[in-house]
């Protein structure tokens, strides 16, 4: 193929915004029942509706919740753990529209199981132990009857006969992960309390289950205010396992002994993360095969590994796969299923045979493909940052077999900041990154200090320093790449969503390095966020900024909206009108302030969208609007036809 010389940003790309919006689904929770595998799909072409899909042993696939039923819970606002499979083949799921639990039998329409008016449910497990009268679910319930900011969380038992509910445990701000021992005689669960987030400190509880289904003898067996516990799980032999970061890394442990003599044994101590930041319910990184061995995934140096730990020798054996990210791992007798992402193909639901170790893709997140020659693969970089420390990022060079940039030019750079902020970016194939690299942009996706996957100390770098450390690392990643001659420092943009949007706004306000930026539902006013957010994150800022309202002066000082006189760069803001995590008033206020300053600015508000865009039309419009904006600021004309964006002061 003959290379055509065109300015960076002008390159024609096969990766269109319409392709990304319409052909990409959101893969979520995985569940197993015997040889059956089920998972959730968020479908942009169905207005973001979440569908539970079942794949039987014979390979047939079918939707379990028909339209208009939407299997998504608003518990903790971010949801997760929205469905469970029952022994009789039925599905129980939370319906987004009314947040009630519905039972969908293999034949017939879903029928409401619960009938509350202000309840939300998540993380349900069946409790239908043979030879007992119990036929119920045990789940987390949020009661929003009196207040959403003070919603009451409990563990409840829900009868599968008539939906009646019985409170099993209460008295803490948050509950998650109820896990029943295989014989039904004990229940484990997690709690945490304000101001902690689950990755700061959480507590693992264990109780006996009486014959009448009530809990007795509840006691703490691990965790605390400075130790994070993740995913309690029972082995087939009835031994409780969990992940803890007590050593600085989320490692696996098992509880040996009973009562006061119980002790936690580290199974395979190593500088690796077997746990994750519990942003949603139902997360899973390990399980047990038919021989009682642990099949697990862990993260080292920003990449996921798959492994098996022998139940007797505790020796860890890595399992080679083509996947660099592995999540939602569920384990059956002789197989496992997970969501896997490679560096060259979209994420997929994958089944691995634990005997042959062969992998089968059951469902790809995208029905579209792109020639490998167009794919930019991540280069992991470690770069110097403030305080003599090092930070991490993933660099993607521009790649398009049909084009090259002018000989005397270096590519423009887009610096991406992930959301959370207690989260991480991964090297897995991402259409949203390939959209830019195939058009001639370089991209660096920054795992700034505070990101997960590098141990507790790295995660704690953001304690009290949000808006400082993340911004420093974003700037220093760009400087590092410019210093080695990979990008043009005079044509740099920064973009991010949610917490990444806050990093973007801070960088454009408190630094003068970037020429422009794009904030997707980003935070401009920390004081407003502290006053007007949901319960799960209502004290999150205590750790990231300082206690509210005692540290109000610091909240003011870290809020970009208060210092618009320091702005010197254009920006585009993209916001959902139904966002409860970051109210749209924040985007409007930031837009008004930037416009008054006389800087180029654009604002797009999307009806029906919340915190994160789910509808195909929104996803397409947002991507194209951002590209159009960069074209106007950097002085290039994107290939193809793009609807113009109204840009004030330009």
Label each PLM-derived region with a short phrase.
Residues 195, 365-490, 497, 531, ...:
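Cap/lid segment of the alpha/beta-hydrolase catalytic domain
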Residues 23-36, 70-91, 118-137, 171-187, ...:
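Conserved beta-propeller blade repeats
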Residues 14-21, 62-73, 109-115, 164-169, ...:
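A short beta-strand motif characteristic of beta-propeller blades
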Residues 26-29, 40-41, 50, 62-63, ...:
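Non-catalytic accessory segments flanking enzyme active sites
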Residues 56-59, 105-108, 159-163, 209-213, ...:
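Short loop/turn segments that connect beta-strands within beta-propeller blades
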